[in-house]
A protein has these predicted regions:
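CheY-like receiver
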Residues: 108-122
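Short active-site neighborhood of thiol/selenol oxidoreductases, capturing the structured segment around
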Residues: 16-28
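Non-catalytic, surface beta->alpha helical segment in thiol-disulfide oxidoreductase systems
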Residues: 71, 76-111
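Thiol-based oxidoreductase modules, predominantly thioredoxin-like and allied folds used
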Residues: 4-6, 25, 36-62, 69
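Substrate-binding pocket helix/loop in short-chain dehydrogenase/reductase
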Residues: 11
Length: 122
């Protein structure tokens, strides 16, 4: 699957409509970000069941601010609309592959229970 450009117009719908999303926060002036792009694109091609999206922090700073991204590149993994991992700083292909494997195996049971409890309180 191709990497999707995420912005304030499509971010929420993307998260709501896709059960597994990995977001790369980047900027065009950031050399480590630009170097990471082919790694991120290769991971997207190797994992077509996951939506991979990129947020340009210059064009969409409000998204980066909302998720408190203080350093780029940054990765955010979202499953079932819940952020399960955030990482800031450079990451190579082997580490990204391990992170994806971890996210696939992450047990969402406690997350679901937490949100069910929160909904019940409303």
């Amino acid at each position: 699957m191709a990497v999707v450009a995420l912005n304030k117009e499509n971010f929420k719908d993307t998260i709501v409509n896709n059960p597994f999303v990995i977001v790369d926060f980047w900027a065009p002036w950031c050399e480590p970000c630009v170097s990471f792009t082919p790694i991120f694109e290769a991971a997207a091609a190797a994992n077509p069941d996951i939506l991979f999206g990129m947020v340009d922090t210059e064009a969409s700073p409000e998204i980066a601010e909302y998720f408190e991204v203080g350093k780029i590149p940054g990765i955010l993994i979202i499953r079932e609309q819940a952020g399960i991992h955030a990482q800031q700083g450079e990451i190579g292909a082997p580490a990204l592959d391990k992170l994806i494997e971890w996210a696939r195996e992450f047990d969402m049971k406690q997350v679901r229970e937490y949100y069910a409890e929160q909904d019940a309180k409303k």
